[in-house]
């Protein structure tokens, strides 16, 4: 069946770039670009060093979930353990192991990379590398000075229901948890 959709060139070319802000967490840029139709436009976007997020599941089918206050939303959110890379060349797997251990005290002997997640692709280049971890051991946490996090283990099926009920607004948590469910069902 013919749809009438026509394929077009989508690539935009950067003409120049100006850094507007350089902070601890992110950098903001304003670029002038050439559009595929020949017109010029402006793109404002955030550059982020990147991050990791981990679904850590124990032998009872429970996953580690964090409760933390998120200032931009002025509310406590439930999320999987996550954190930013320490440098642009840091191995994401090593960052995932570090963040899981620091925030929850959990170490895992098995990790599977589930792929990249782009949380805000319209205005940021942030990439969150998603991991599934199992064969867990529990120890002491070592939170950063600016972190206040409560941790609990929640049944994976209950977490899925919380997502479907709209109780987990965090995108990386939704994507990673549902991907784990799909992977487990495919086995």
Regions found by a protein language model. Give the residues of each.
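Extreme N-terminal tail/first-helix region
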Residues: 1-22
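Conserved Nudix-box catalytic region and its N-terminal flanking loop in Nudix hydrolases
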Residues: 9, 43, 53-98, 141
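Acidic, metal-coordinating catalytic segment for phosphate/diphosphate chemistry
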Residues: 16-53, 59
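Unchanged
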Residues: 41, 50-53, 84-171
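Generic C-terminal helix-cap and adjacent flexible tail
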Residues: 182-187
